[in-house]
Amino acid sequence: MNIGNMKATDVKAYISNILKSEDKSIDYEALIRTLEDDNRVTVKNLGKNVIKFLENRKKERIRVRNMYEFDKKYIKSGTYLAGADEVGRGPLAGPIVAAAVVLDLDIINDENLILRINDSKKISFEVREELSKIIKERAVSYSIQEISSEEIDEKGIAWCNNEVLKRSVCNLKVDPDLVLSDGYKIKNCTINNEFVVKGDAKSASIACASIIAKVYRDNLMIEYSKKYPEYMFNKNMGYGTKEHIEAIKKFGCTKIHRKSFLKNILNTF
């Protein structure tokens, strides 16, 4: 493509699309030279944008590589490590969900790293959706499990929290040699298990588990919002926002509400 014959606005759109797609076939050094040699100031500045993009991508690869290396130090080459995390411990409605993910930790080429992984709460909805698909495609194995609000009411959130993590690990298609869980150890787990404080920001495997668990649960709550629109589950995901609590007081609870969590809100239970 001859950038010199393009309008500045078209060049800007072209560069934007390249950076979004992270096209591996692009010779970025040649592209930067072409932009910097252009007589138009706006086009020259796009060269700076590409340089900044490459610098940020390098930093991101280093950050994520460190997350992979964090996991690798726990196991020997050729063995499996699973990262496990849960989402939905605190909401007033909906299930608690956990995921376990086994990654290929022997990746040599940085191009194959799953970039942008992190604590799922620090990632936008759109990026989480995109990453969830990538994680599922590239994972050696993954498992997503849920425990309903009814079972939470019956057995308590502490038991369910541990149980859903245990189920996620036990339903993997490969047998991990070690499980890393976020925050605390999984009790009564037959597989060797260690916990990592703030693990979803340190461990690649835990971060990936955090992301796919949250995406699964968020999409489930969005579907529930179609059945129960008064509660705005598509916005609060079942958490106790002011609007959600007001809706409970006005309309009562649904089948997916955790009645054991509502004793201080309603006097019905």
Swiss-Prot record:
Q: Report whether Acyltransferase shows up as a keyword of the record.
A: no
What CDD domains would the database entry show?
Answer: RNase_HII_bacteria_HII_like
InterPro entries in the record, alphabetically?
A: RNase_HII, RNase_HII/HIII, RNase_HII/HIII_dom, RNaseH-like_sf, RNaseH_sf
Q: Which GO terms describe its molecular function?
A: manganese ion binding; RNA binding; RNA-DNA hybrid ribonuclease activity
Q: Which residues form the RNase H type-2 domain?
A: 79-269
As recorded in UniProt, its EC number(s) are 3.1.26.4
Enzyme class name: hydrolase
What does the record give as cofactor?
Answer: Mn(2+); Mg(2+)
Q: How is the cofactor bound?
A: Manganese or magnesium. Binds 1 divalent metal ion per monomer in the absence of substrate. May bind a second metal ion after substrate binding.
Q: Where does a divalent metal cation bind?
A: D85, E86, D182
Record-level GO BP terms: DNA replication, removal of RNA primer; mismatch repair
Catalytic activity, per the record?
Answer: Endonucleolytic cleavage to 5'-phosphomonoester
Keywords associated with the record: Cytoplasm, Endonuclease, Hydrolase, Manganese, Metal-binding, Nuclease
Q: Tell me which family the UniProt entry assigns to this protein.
A: Belongs to the RNase HII family.
Q: What NCBIfam families is this protein classified in? A: PRK00015.1-1, PRK00015.1-3
Under what name is this protein listed?
Ribonuclease HII
Task: Give me the gene this protein comes from.
Answer: rnhB
